[in-house]
Design a protein with these regions (language model features):
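Helix-to-loop junction immediately C-terminal to a conserved catalytic motif
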Residues: 45
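Conserved ABC ATPase "signature" region
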Residues: 93, 97, 104-122
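Catalytic Walker B motif of ABC-type/P-loop ATPase nucleotide-binding domains
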Residues: 151-154
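Conserved ABC ATPase signature
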Residues: 126-130
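Conserved ABC transporter NBD signature motif
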Residues: 53-64, 68-69
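ABC transporter nucleotide-binding domain
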Residues: 168-226
Length: 226
């Protein structure tokens, strides 16, 4: 959970006094560009330090947990780094080593995830030959290598075609049991079918936190579909 979580960049407040509690489930993070979604995710991943406030996991500050907290995380930033001359399989093996997986587990998990994101046939191809959607699918796979208890995905469906987005939704639905999954997107349909809760942000603040039915009921009679 977050307590009074605030992040400022100079005079600009990117995240403004957030107080939220998350339990196991899928959370969709919605908001316009500049709403504070990416900054919030980076704070939750302990990549950036808050200006004030705290983030707690089981009542313990994540700053004090250090590596123990990071071992529980899977993260896909909007633009993830990769070595263009690595094959998809070699890249996942490399990231597996960084995450501390042993040889046997790394091989097994890499193969499983390449299958899950439909890249098995391209596993030996160099990443520089991949389309944007293929790279994004590889990014989703690397975030899941360590079987994280907390999975944070920033714009995970960017570059995916409709068929790939359906596969992604099915993958997250299957993976989310007994885990916290947070994904930000501009594509409402990506979270409409899999998110138990929607977090809507504007100007660094949460303007709505609830299930999709609650959101639609609030605007009932104000929106018409043609």
């Amino acid at each position: 959970k977050t307590i009074g979580l605030t992040k400022k960049f100079g005079s600009k407040t990117a995240v403004d006094n957030l107080n939220i509690t998350l339990t196991n489930g899928v959370y969709g993070l919605l908001g316009a560009n500049g709403a504070g979604k990416t900054t919030l995710m980076r704070l939750l991943c302990n990549i950036q330090n808050p200006t004030s406030g705290r983030i707690l996991l089981n009542e313990k500050n994540i700053v004090g947990l250090g590596e123990r907290y990071r071992n529980l995380l899977g993260y896909l930033p909007q633009h993830f780094g990769y070595y263009p001359d690595f094959s998809a399989y070699d890249f996942l093996r490399y990231v597996s080593a960084l995450k501390g997986l042993d040889e046997k587990a790394a091989h097994k998990k890499s193969k499983e995830l390449l299958e899950a994101v439909d890249l098995s046939r391209e596993s030996k191809h160099k990443i520089k030959t991949f389309s944007g959607g293929m790279k994004q699918r590889l990014g989703i796979a690397q975030a899941m290598l360590n079987d994280p208890r907390i999975l944070i995905l920033d714009e995970p469906t960017a570059g995916l075609d409709p068929k790939e987005r359906v596969r992604f939704r099915n993958l997250i639905s299957a993976f989310s049991k007994d885990r916290i999954v947070i994904l930000s997107t501009h594509i409402v349909s990506d979270v409409e079918f899999i998110a138990e809760e929607i977090i809507m942000m504007k100007s660094g603040q949460i303007i709505h936190f609830g299930n999709p039915q609650e959101i639609t009921s609030e605007i009932d009679g104000q929106v018409w579909e043609c």
